[in-house]
């Protein structure tokens, strides 16, 4: 009997990441993504995302790697498509928390600057990372409204509503839950300001069970519902 080939564990990439040898990590990981035997393995793409993400905040890399953050997102999306369950990247939970925060922060900046096409793309990275991120779909829907993409907005809001109404939305992570709360509050207040109170109340009711003890949510709920 022949032993079945096991998928590589890419411990060499982990070692380079831990040792902060990021350029070497990128070179090695890219080699795996171009190799016929390993190009469909998810971890090399994740390590490329992690490497670029670290480099994006280190001054000495800014000149040679000016697009490090964008490249981090690009490879994060590639990883997510290959690892639907995120099982292979489970031990790197801190990275996912950090990059999600960075994406949300960058999207907020883009929204403030009315660069909605860019913020829309950033929210897409969040939904690529977690297809049950109802908050990301709500915010994505709002950006579609801002750029007058009515059909796409309807699709995003419909997805968010389905996730909330079927209890499939991701709320186990506290930061993701807070993002959902903020998205619901922002969208509900936007609807209410447009004299669409019934829709605002509907959205708040969809998320209410997740925020029964959250003062901020309850204050906004009371101010809109009355």
Q: Where are these predicted regions, by residue range?
A:
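Alpha-solenoid helical repeat scaffolds
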Residues: 30, 70-73, 77, 124, ...
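Start-of-domain marker
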Residues: 6-70
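Terminal, low-structured helical/coil segments at or just beyond the last alpha-helical repeat
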Residues: 178, 183-226
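Short coil turns that delineate tetratricopeptide repeat
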Residues: 37-39, 84, 131, 165, ...
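Extended amphipathic alpha-helical interaction segments
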Residues: 88-192
């Amino acid at each position: 009997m022949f032993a079945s080939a096991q998928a590589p564990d890419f411990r060499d990439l982990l070692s380079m990441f831990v040792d902060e040898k990021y350029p070497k990590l990128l070179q090695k990981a890219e080699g795996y993504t171009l190799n016929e035997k390993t190009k469909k393995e998810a971890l090399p793409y994740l390590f490329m995302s992690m490497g670029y993400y670290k480099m994006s905040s280190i001054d000495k890399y800014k000149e040679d790697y000016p697009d490090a953050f964008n490249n981090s997102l690009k490879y994060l999306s590639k990883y997510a498509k290959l690892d639907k369950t995120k099982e292979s990247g489970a031990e790197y939970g801190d990275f996912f928390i950090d990059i999600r925060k960075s994406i949300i922060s960058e999207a907020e900046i883009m929204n403030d600057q009315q660069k909605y096409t860019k913020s829309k793309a950033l929210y897409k990275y969040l939904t690529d990372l977690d297809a049950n991120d109802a908050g990301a779909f709500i915010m994505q829907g709002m950006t579609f409204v801002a750029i007058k993409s009515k059909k796409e907005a309807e699709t995003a809001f419909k997805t968010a509503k389905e996730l909330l109404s079927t209890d499939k939305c991701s709320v186990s992570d506290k930061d993701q839950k807070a993002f959902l709360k903020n998205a619901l509050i922002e969208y509900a207040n936007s609807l209410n300001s447009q004299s669409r109170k019934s829709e605002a109340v509907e959205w708040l009711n969809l998320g209410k069970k997740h925020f029964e003890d959250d003062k901020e949510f309850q204050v906004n709920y009371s101010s809109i519902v009355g």
